[in-house]
Curated annotation (Swiss-Prot):
Organism of this sequence: Rhizobium johnstonii (strain DSM 114642 / LMG 32736 / 3841)
Superkingdom classification of source: Bacteria
Role description: Binds directly to 23S rRNA. The L1 stalk is quite mobile in the ribosome, and is involved in E site tRNA release. Protein L1 is also a translational repressor protein, it controls the translation of the L11 operon by binding to its mRNA.
Lineage: Bacteria, Pseudomonadati, Pseudomonadota, Alphaproteobacteria, Hyphomicrobiales
Family to which the UniProt record says this protein belongs: Belongs to the universal ribosomal protein uL1 family.
Gene Ontology MF term list: rRNA binding; structural constituent of ribosome; tRNA binding
Protein name: Large ribosomal subunit protein uL1
GO cellular component: cytosolic large ribosomal subunit
Binding partners and assembly: Part of the 50S ribosomal subunit.
Disulfide pairings: none
Keywords, sorted A to Z: Repressor, Ribonucleoprotein, Ribosomal protein, RNA-binding, rRNA-binding, Translation regulation, tRNA-binding
Keyword tRNA-binding set for record: yes
């Protein structure tokens, strides 16, 4: 039964064809028929080899229409900065006590922020937070004195991205319940951020392939130029 359902969902999607962005979004939304609000994800295959330091792609982007998901934020801070984080809506705020909780394997948050003075302490959590992509980093604005701004950005649609070993960068950019225009704006914002993060060591064609999909639906390949405005060299 599940196989027939999958076959029906996949009907009309040509895996060899590149679709215009607006058409691809419509196709993905039509096929997001699960009983929950499926996440829409975009993936970009880049012409980089992240094994080389000068070809790493990493950054953060504030999606104009948010992600549609509730983001739980933890902040490592003391004193006035801890109070600032709480006032901004942080879900968990602490210092040594929060380190102990995380070391004990209790990670009840999706994003982690720290003030610079807390990093020697937070550094102990590298083996726990690093593999999960949660380690605070000044390059993506999660090591900062502006904890209120970072908390609000995290809860308002900030998405971190980092290229994987195969040269792929991907992110959830909304929900199937979003209208097509909102999804298109989010996808373009994400693509723009990835292009701006193009490393100096990247040679040749930078954006090789782009595709979008829903949680349970098929991937729909997109003409890169319809996302980037022009083929990225």
């Amino acid at each position: 039964m599940a196989g027939k359902r999958t076959q029906k969902i996949n009907e009309g999607v040509d895996p060899t064809k590149l679709y215009a962005l607006t058409l691809a979004i419509g196709m993905v939304k039509e096929r997001a028929v699960a009983k929950f609000d499926e996440t829409i994800e975009v993936s970009m295959n880049l012409g980089v080899d992240p094994r080389h330091a000068d070809q790493m792609v990493r950054g953060v982007v504030n999606l104009p229409n948010g992600t549609g998901r509730t983001v739980r934020v933890a902040v490592f801070a003391r004193g006035a900065k801890a109070d600032e984080a709480k006032a901004a809506g942080a879900d968990i705020v602490g210092a040594e006590d929060l380190v102990e909780i995380v070391q004990g394997g209790k990670i009840e948050f999706d994003r982690c922020i720290a003030t610079p003075d807390m990093m020697p302490l937070v550094g102990r959590l590298g083996k726990v937070l690093g593999p999960r992509g949660m380690m605070p980093n000044p390059k993506v604005g999660t090591v900062t004195m502006d904890v209120a701004g970072a908390v609000k950005a995290s809860k308002g649609g900030a998405v971190e991205f980092r290229v994987e070993k195969a040269g792929i960068v991907h992110a959830g950019i909304g929900k199937a319940s979003f209208d097509a225009k909102a999804l298109e704006e989010n996808i373009r914002a994400f693509a723009d951020a990835v292009i701006k993060a193009k490393p100096a060591g990247a040679k040749g064609n930078y954006v090789k392939r782009v595709a979008i999909s829903s949680t349970m639906g098929p991937g729909v390949k997109i003409e890169p130029g319809s996302v980037t405005g022009a083929p990225a060299a």
